[in-house]
Amino acid sequence: MSEKNDTLVQVEHLKKYFPIKGVKGPGVQAVEDISIEIKRGETLGLVGESGCGKTTLGRTILRLIPATEGQVMYNGEDILTYDKKKMWEMRRKLQIIFQDPSASLDPRMTVGEIIGEAIDIHKLAANKKDRADMIKGLLARVGLNTEHANRYPHEFSGGQQQRVGIARALAVNPEFIVCDEPISALDVSIQSQVVNMLEDMQHEMGLTYLFIAHDLSVVRHISHRIGVMYLGTMVELAESYELNRHPLHPYTTVSYTHLRAHETDQY
């Protein structure tokens, strides 16, 4: 396969500024001139301190918020130029797993309705039985039971809620998923289960991830390559093992120093 075909997402000089009311100028520069590529089937980890722009970058790539400038090439086409109809069709391929599952799930809907909504919107089921079978399969895929379809989000633990969020993202059979700090709101005992599940799904379904987190130990475990953001810019991008061995930017060096000290304290 050629290098061009290996690249699923190509971000070129992407910028996102948020205007400040009553203040002239570009405003808050949340994402500043970022260019990255994400290869088909890989996990690109994205780390940085709170407020560095990593979540904004992920949402801008998905066009959940509009870009100020730049390009987002998906399979060689700039999706930032798509009209509403074409972008709606593209939504099946692009999904997101949110940080806080309790806030991202509609409390008035059952789990079956939440997962089934995406199936209905994109008309993926031939009939009611097909729809029910799809929901059942998605629940099983994330480690939940068929009976859970009739329950509401508040009846689940945080880890179970996040599994519902993952099932919802998978419902449309996507190619690319932005995982926006998907385990930061979960208990430590549950985090590894969710990460392992995401890895298994990637291998089985050929998924491509942009995995956003502030916990370097998690990102190091799941990612093929890691990008480091600082004040809206990408200050470092390297293979996971190489970044671990030879961090170059001061922020990355300090982050790995703290991680190694924490790992040493545990033994």
Language model regions located:
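Conserved small/polar residues in nucleotide/adenosyl-binding loops
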Residues: 52, 257-264
